[in-house]
């Protein structure tokens, strides 16, 4: 996908990985970058606008846990303004296994609902033009961090949803791929709660291992966007971008 002159919606594009990815996207010159986030960050939005004045950067407050109909209303506002949207990035995520319901609501249900909502505007069965979805999942969808099983399971669920959804492209006209960062130096991983307190030092232990910066992750994210491979399972780890070959152990046969 060519980012230049495109219209992109980025859910949670003002966080750690999100903000550095937004910077890299803006450098590539989209026509519009629409940021949907729970918390406003005027300084970051001003920075992004100044980085490339030819890009229109817009912010709308959005919590991915709202009912599906509210998401549809917000997207209608955006589509009424832009007319077309080329790419939806679902990037909302929390890491706190003390908050079981919210972890599932943000990391999994929010991704499903935002994707479902945009189908009203993209699905070719409804006369839509199609589009592209990039879902930020996690390497924990491959192998869990067992001390945070709720987080790991929520990301595995988001990955499974994405791998199923991309197979529907022939029916819907909408393609999809997953972005799976490894341990990245963000606020998210500096301090978080393990499930039932099974490992109070889990954040500290993780950070003893090699990590990557949000800039490295953002740069590789843009490479994945440009590659635009339907069904790709991208691993963004240690400053590298690698396509994962999924091992098939079972097939529904339908």
Swiss-Prot record:
Q: Which GO terms describe its biological process?
A: alcohol metabolic process
Q: Name one Pfam family in it.
A: adh_short
User: EC number(s) on record?
Assistant: 1.1.1.1
Query: What Gene Ontology terms describe where this protein resides (cellular component)?
Result: cytoplasm
Keywords of this entry? NAD, Oxidoreductase
Q: Where does NAD(+) bind?
A: 10-33
Q: Where does substrate bind?
A: 138
Q: Per its UniProt entry, which superkingdom is the organism in?
A: Eukaryota
Q: In the UniProt entry, which residues are flagged as the active site?
A: 151
- Cystine links in this protein are none
Recorded catalytic reaction(s): these are: a primary alcohol + NAD(+) = an aldehyde + NADH + H(+); a secondary alcohol + NAD(+) = a ketone + NADH + H(+)
Can you provide one Gene Ontology molecular function annotated for this UniProt record? Answer: alcohol dehydrogenase (NAD+) activity
Could you say which enzyme class this protein belongs to?
oxidoreductase
Does the UniProt entry include the keyword Cytoplasm? Answer: no
Q: How does it assemble?
A: Homodimer.
Assigned protein family: Belongs to the short-chain dehydrogenases/reductases (SDR) family.
Q: What is this protein called?
A: Alcohol dehydrogenase
To which species is this protein native?
A: Drosophila adiastola
């Amino acid at each position: 996908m060519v980012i230049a002159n495109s219209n992109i919606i980025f859910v949670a594009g003002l966080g750690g990985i999100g903000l550095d990815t937004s910077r890299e996207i803006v450098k590539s010159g989209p026509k519009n970058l629409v940021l949907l986030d729970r918390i406003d960050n005027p300084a970051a939005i001003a920075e992004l606008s100044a980085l490339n004045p030819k890009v229109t950067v817009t912010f709308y407050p959005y919590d991915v846990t709202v009912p599906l109909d509210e998401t549809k209303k917000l997207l209608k506002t955006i589509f009424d303004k832009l007319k077309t949207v080329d790419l939806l990035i679902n990037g909302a995520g929390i890491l706190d296994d003390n908050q079981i319901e919210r972890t599932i609501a943000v990391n999994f249900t929010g991704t499903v609902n935002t994707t479902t909502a945009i189908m009203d505007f993209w699905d070719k069965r409804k006369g839509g033009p199609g589009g592209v979805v990039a879902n930020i999942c996690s390497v924990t969808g491959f192998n869990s961090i067992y001390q945070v099983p709720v987080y790991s399971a929520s990301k595995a669920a988001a990955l499974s949803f994405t791998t199923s959804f991309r197979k529907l492209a022939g029916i819907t006209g909408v393609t999809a791929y997953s972005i799976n960062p490894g341990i990245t130096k963000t606020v998210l991983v500096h301090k978080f709660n393990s499930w039932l307190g099974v490992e109070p030092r889990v954040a500290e232990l993780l950070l003893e291992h090699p990590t990557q910066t949000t800039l490295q992750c953002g740069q590789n994210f843009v490479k994945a966007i440009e590659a635009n491979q339907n069904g790709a399972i991208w691993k963004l780890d240690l400053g590298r971008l690698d396509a994962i070959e999924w091992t098939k152990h079972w097939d529904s046969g339908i």
